[in-house]
Amino acid sequence: LAEIESSALTMRFSGISTIMYGGAAMNACWVLENHPACYFKFPKPQLSGGSLWDFAASACLFKEMGVVVSDMQSKSLDLNRADSTFMNHRGVLYASNDEIADQIKLIYSKATRNK
C-alpha cells in the first residue's frame, strides 16, 4: 500500500482510501462512483478469487463507457477460458483513468521483477 500511496501523491491526489469489503462486481462499480479510483487483483497461481461471472458485466460497462478494464498486461479480460472460470491467472484491473491504470501496472511490474 505504501507504493500505491506514493503514486497517488505523485499524481497529485490527497492520498488513498481502501475498501476491504464487497465483491468483484460491487468493487468495480465503486470505481465508477468514486473517481479517481481503481480496483485490481494481481495475478496469482492459486485457483481462487473471482470467476468470470463476477467480472463480465462490469467489464462490459467499463468498455461501453470508455473506462479502463484489463488484465495486468493491458490485455482484455480472459472471460472465455476453457480450463477454468477463475480470473486469477492474469489478474484484473479497473481504473477510472489511464494514469491510475498505468501506475498500478507499473507497481505490479516492479513487484514481479523483484521476486
Report residues per predicted region.
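An extended, acidic
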Residues: 1-115
